[in-house]
Amino acid sequence: MAAHGLKRARPAELVPGTLSVITARMDYLPRDTPPDWVDHEWQRLQRPGEAIVSVYARGRDYHKVLRARLQQLADRIAAQIGPFGHRVFTDSAPVLEVELASRSGIGWRGKHTLTLHREAGSMFFLGEIY
């Protein structure tokens, strides 16, 4: 982490020319998740002989999904304003994503170091466009 100190704290050190950062969140659960999903999870916890995979790891690789969505957003922006140098990050570079999310209004850093949001809790991924 020390080797990337300046790159973490100064976006332009990581991607030269960066003036702004777009920060986004993607919820763990798909939109069509039944409202009683928590009840099902509690029932699963009552069966100690059954292995349980964490909710965030049950779907497709979030790195690929969120990166693709952010790239689509960057492409739409470029279609409106013209080409701009950018990079998309999803947990893949020395980026202070929790700090960026806090500053952008997505949430705040909880005592457990995750970003918290009043409705979503901490059940979401973060990604950035530099």
Model-derived segments and their meaning:
Residues 1-130:
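Auxiliary alpha/beta "docking" domains used to position bulky ligands
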